[in-house]
């Protein structure tokens, strides 16, 4: 075997096996899974709220949704992570993985809001009109008719 291959194998054995550094990788996978699960849940919640703001008839809510979506989608996620960690949560004693989950949840919320908005807009206006003609109010029409059909398109 070539000497450089022996050196690589020896270095790998020393670093990962004898010095137990594989345990760091395993714990890192656990943190990654925690951050991912929390960020996905938070992103879906934020995305749903922002999608409703973007679809609202209220100009103020639409403006908030548009500003949020434009700013978050227009800045790199690492920049957002650094601002949230070093500026917003600088004086708060909170675990680092929670801050990362919040940052990635906020970031994914902007993208999820557009997916949900597109799913809701993909439902024919006739469905909303049918619900309204049956005597349902706007909330009932959205929750009983539009959103169940939109979920098929969203997922």
Where are these regions (language model features)?
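Transmembrane alpha-helices and adjacent helix-loop boundaries
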Residues: 1-155
């Amino acid at each position: 075997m070539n000497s450089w291959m022996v050196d690589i194998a020896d270095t790998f054995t020393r670093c990962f096996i004898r010095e137990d550094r594989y345990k760091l990788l395993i714990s890192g996978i656990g943190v990654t899974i925690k951050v991912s699960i929390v960020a996905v849940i938070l992103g879906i919640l934020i995305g749903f709220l922002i999608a409703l703001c973007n679809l609202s008839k209220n100009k103020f809510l639409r403006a908030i949704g548009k500003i949020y979506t434009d700013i978050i989608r227009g800045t790199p996620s690492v920049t957002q992570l650094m601002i949230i960690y070093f500026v917003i949560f600088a004086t708060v004693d909170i675990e680092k993985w929670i801050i990362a989950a919040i940052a990635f949840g906020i970031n994914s919320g902007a993208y999820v809001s557009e997916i949900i908005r597109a799913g809701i807009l993909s439902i024919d206006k006739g469905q909303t009109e049918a619900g309204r003609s049956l005597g349902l109010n706007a909330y009932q029409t959205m929750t009983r008719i539009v959103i169940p059909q939109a979920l098929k398109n969203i997922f």
